[in-house]
């Protein structure tokens, strides 16, 4: 039995499903998943609280949080330094910072396409937050990000199942730019793939728009206008992702990759064919 632990500090779009993607119909054998969440907060105090999760004895841990260089996630890495750990975050994007993670023994999947939300009280409420995350999830799922992460987590799970542990595990070190993500989506139609790639580029742009609204602007009109613009970009990206999938559906070429009971990744493209 492979024990996979997930620590969710704060929220990314990918946080909504990351603990579900290895066992999508709850029928996979040989894997057990547990989740420790700190809600919306992601500071050093929340990082310290994750210490109690060590009692479950995970074979490896996935920590997902915005901004892996922030104080909270930095503190969390100290807590989990001696456990095989993969950091999933929207940054850092600089190569030197990512290399430092690797030198410290951490795996990472950095997702610049997982967008920064317009987190200002003047603009964001629970409904706006939920709608934004729904749009983000549409892009992350259809355009290849979900499958990329699922495949990487499955690789580590397979290593544990084969008897490897601790420092023997080969952890991913991935900077998931749009071009890399879309290759995991399995598009057959080039126009569908182009729409998906456009959606990923738009999602990456959202952070550039929302960052000033969150951390720089002071005037309420500028804050609200800028954050609203960022969210409109995300909504348009979700529409492109939907269009891409509809093209594949119309051609009966939607690529599906369900898990067999033993964790093997099966494949199918025709709706009525059996996964092989």
Residue ranges and their predicted role:
Residues 1-58, 64-276:
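Anaerobic metallocofactor- and corrinoid-dependent redox/one-carbon enzyme cores
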């Amino acid at each position: 039995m492979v024990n996979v632990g997930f620590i969710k500090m704060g929220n990314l779009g990918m946080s909504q499903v990351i603990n579900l993607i290895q066992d999508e119909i709850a029928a996979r054998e040989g894997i057990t998943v547990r989740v420790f969440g700190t809600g919306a907060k992601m500071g050093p105090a929340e990082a310290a609280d994750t210490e109690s999760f060590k009692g479950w004895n995970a074979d490896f841990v996935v920590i997902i949080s915005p901004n892996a260089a922030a104080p909270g996630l930095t503190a969390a890495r100290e807590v989990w330094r001696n456990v095989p750990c993969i950091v999933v975050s929207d940054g850092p994007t600089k190569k030197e910072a990512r290399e430092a993670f690797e030198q410290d023994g951490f795996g990472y999947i950095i997702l610049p396409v997982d967008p920064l939300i317009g987190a200002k009280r003047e603009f964001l409420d629970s409904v706006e937050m939920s709608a934004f995350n729904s749009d983000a999830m549409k892009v992350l799922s259809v355009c290849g990000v979900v499958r990329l992460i699922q495949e990487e987590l499955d690789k580590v799970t397979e290593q544990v199942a084969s008897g490897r542990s601790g420092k023997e595990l080969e952890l991913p070190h991935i900077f998931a730019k749009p071009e890399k993500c879309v290759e995991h989506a399995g598009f057959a139609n080039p126009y569908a793939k182009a729409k998906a790639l456009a959606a990923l580029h738009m999602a990456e742009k959202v952070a550039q728009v929302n960052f000033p609204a969150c951390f720089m602007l002071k005037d309420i009109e500028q804050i609200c206008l800028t954050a609203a613009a960022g969210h409109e970009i995300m909504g348009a990206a979700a529409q492109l992702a939907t269009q891409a999938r509809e093209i594949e559906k119309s051609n009966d070429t939607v690529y599906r990759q369900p898990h067999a009971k033993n964790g093997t990744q099966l494949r199918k493209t025709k709706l009525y064919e059996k996964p092989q």
